[in-house]
């Protein structure tokens, strides 16, 4: 069952009790324990795969197997009636009206039916595949850790009407997930009250989550290493004779343009966010260092052309020492803060 176009509904259902004369229509709107305490719902999720975490779109793509289970005494039958298990379309029976609120296009891969045993135990099984929204905190990118939630909410029942069992669990073989860019750790499920606005009506909610730690080795080779090579080129300009103007200016100017182009192209891989990531700080500090290096080269060229060649050479020697020291400080400030 799909709610609107963006919301996936995990529907749970209860069949009718033939001996009591109840019909499916009699049971679709009333809770099994109406007038008493809340009905207890058990949710089990098997995380089969996390195919991708998309930083730019802020979604992660999952493959899930879901089981939702609860008890309805109205559906119990004696041992001489019917088969061991009965199957019902979920639209014909009561269910706790569950939806995944961060769904962004999950697909149903199994029939939408409920299975009921003789004791009135109801189980709905479904396999889901598709994207889920996630609010990524990229301040420490690419050395960041993200919480990937699966947020389940009843859009009709409050916490006083249904509760989620402590037996609800997330099961997964984390070492077998296909995404080599991340390492994962499953968290315990948490029940909560969901509200659209402060003081509004509350709905029963249950969150499953996985902590994902980014493997930074890829970014060391694609960001830090190219940036270091560009800065090394800027540093080498200080080793040229101070009166070799074309080579020194050409080298310094090339590093500035290369660094700006590289930083812009790298930033396009991230979403439009209102803060700077650790990688952004690294690019900005490195660009500032290259601009300072260019300014030093301009000064030394100017001095060398106005009978201050000795002072120009001393400044160039100082720059040779200061440049790697400042770059080391940039790395420490950016990635160890």
Predicted features along the sequence, with ranges:
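Generic detector of short, well-ordered, non-transmembrane alpha-helical segments enriched
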Residues: 14, 60, 144-145, 254, ...
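Intrinsically disordered, low-complexity peripheral segments of secretory-pathway and membrane proteins
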Residues: 19-74, 80, 268, 275-337
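Short linear sequence elements within intrinsically disordered, low-complexity coil regions
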Residues: 13, 70, 75, 197-199, ...
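Bacterial N-terminal signal peptides
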Residues: 5-15
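Channel- or pocket-lining gating/hinge segments that regulate access to a cavity or pore
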Residues: 206-326
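A generic membrane alpha-helix/interface feature
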Residues: 67, 81, 115, 153, ...
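Soluble non-transmembrane domains of integral membrane proteins
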Residues: 19-211
């Amino acid at each position: 069952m799909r709610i609107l176009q963006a919301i996936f509904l995990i529907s749970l259902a209860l069949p009718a009790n033939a001996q009591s004369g109840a019909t499916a229509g009699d049971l679709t709107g009333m809770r099994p324990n109406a007038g008493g305490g809340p009905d207890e719902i058990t949710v089990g999720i098997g995380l089969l795969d996390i195919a991708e975490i998309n930083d730019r779109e802020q979604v992660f793509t999952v493959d899930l197997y879901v089981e939702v289970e609860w008890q309805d005494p109205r559906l119990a039958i004696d041992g001489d009636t019917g088969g061991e298990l009965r199957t019902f379309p979920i639209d014909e029976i009561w269910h706790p009206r569950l939806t995944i609120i961060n769904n962004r296009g999950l697909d149903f891969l199994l029939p939408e039916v409920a299975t009921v045993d003789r004791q009135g135990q109801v189980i709905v099984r479904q396999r889901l595949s598709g994207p889920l929204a996630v609010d990524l905190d990229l301040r420490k990118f690419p050395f960041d850790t993200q919480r990937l939630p699966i947020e389940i909410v009843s859009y009709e029942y409050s916490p006083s009407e249904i509760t989620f069992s402590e037996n609800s669990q997330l099961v997964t073989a984390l070492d077998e997930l296909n995404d080599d860019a991340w390492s994962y750790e499953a968290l315990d499920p948490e029940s909560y009250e969901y509200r659209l606005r402060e003081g509004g009506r509350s709905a029963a909610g249950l969150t499953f989550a996985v902590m994902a730690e980014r493997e930074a080795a890829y970014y060391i080779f694609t960001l830090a290493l190219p940036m270091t090579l560009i800065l090394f080129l800027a540093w080498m300009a200080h080793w040229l004779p101070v009166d070799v103007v074309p080579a020194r200016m050409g080298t310094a100017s090339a590093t500035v343009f290369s660094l700006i182009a590289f930083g812009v192209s790298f930033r396009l891989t991230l979403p439009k966010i209102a803060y700077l990531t650790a990688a952004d700080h690294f690019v900005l500090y490195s660009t500032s260092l290259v601009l300072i290096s260019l300014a030093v080269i301009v000064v030394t060229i100017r001095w060398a052309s106005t009978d201050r060649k000795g002072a120009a050479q001393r400044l160039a020697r100082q720059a040779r020492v200061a440049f790697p020291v400042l770059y080391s400080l940039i790395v420490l400030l950016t990635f160890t803060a």
